[in-house]
Amino acid sequence: SIRRQRQMCIRDRLNTNENPYPPSPKVAEALQKFELDSLRLYPDPASTDLVNALAERYHVQADQVYTGVGSDDVLAIAFLTFFNSGKPILFPDITYSFYDVWAELFQIPYERPALDDAFALRLEDYQCENGGIVIANPNAPTGIRQSEEFLRAVIEANPNVVVIIDEAYADFSGYTALPLVDEYENVVVVQTFSKSRSMAGMRIGHAIGNTKLIKAMNDVRYSFNSYPMTRLSVALGVAALSDQDYFEETTAKIVATRERTKQALTELGFTFGDSMTNFIFATHKTVPATHLFLSLIHIS
């Protein structure tokens, strides 16, 4: 828990899935060059430099890009913006733990269809009447990625509601649903700088979608905060995006470590799904999870 973490001297927090590598050297360079005097001025409300850098990086128009204080902030605004029909929204029973928190906070009815025996989503659960859909892809904490065919089927079965695809871990999976944004008007893809770009401490997230959807999110956001992104976060975010070679190098290292870990876990008697993230959702054939948990606490 957060309370327990505050009470303990923790060097490595595996539960937050932080990146073990530092941010790009270009981020360090941008930090050194940052004009401290500029902090006396309010930042650009539209985060124009970061929006333009994201648009260039992902080959979309600037008015298709929304930026926020981490993907949690982006997702919360998306919930407020799109999920107000009174019909229940849908997301899996095992997924990112904040979806139901936001739904309850904003008084949005919701249902949580169970995953199948392989911890995958079942298409039929998302082909019923609903008020919107949220899919973490790859999913957390299972690490399992749904296919593009599955995503298309869900989107096409729900043309009148917004489908949010949360891609916090997509960079470790070799697949992104971003091309679907230009094919379907009801899709919003949410990503973060926290995982693959080693910038969890800066809190930078973004969404990409149809221009009307992004405008709607901005309209809601500006009613809460006219200056959501700091000058420093924008400058360092732009710097991170400028170093694609470093991003690809460190991401490849993490993927290689994941695959080695899978092999080692298999040899130790663990079973798990095909994780496409920077974590592995594993169980042991004979040793209970509680025993493993308590043993790890004792060791650390």
Task: Name each model-derived stretch.
Residues R11-P22, A28-N52, R57:
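A glycine-/small-polar-enriched, mobile loop at the entrance of the PLP active site in fold-type I
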Residues P22-S24, A46, N186-T266, F270-G273:
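PLP-dependent aminotransferase class I/II
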Residues S1-R6, I10, I297-H298:
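Single conserved hydrophobic/aromatic residue that forms the stacking wall/gate
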Residues A120-E129, P141-V163, E167-M199:
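Active-site pre-lysine segment of PLP-dependent enzymes
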Residues D49-P88:
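Phosphate-binding glycine-rich loop
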Residues T81-A136:
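PLP-dependent aminotransferase-like
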Residues E267-S295:
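Conserved PLP-binding catalytic core of the aspartate aminotransferase-like
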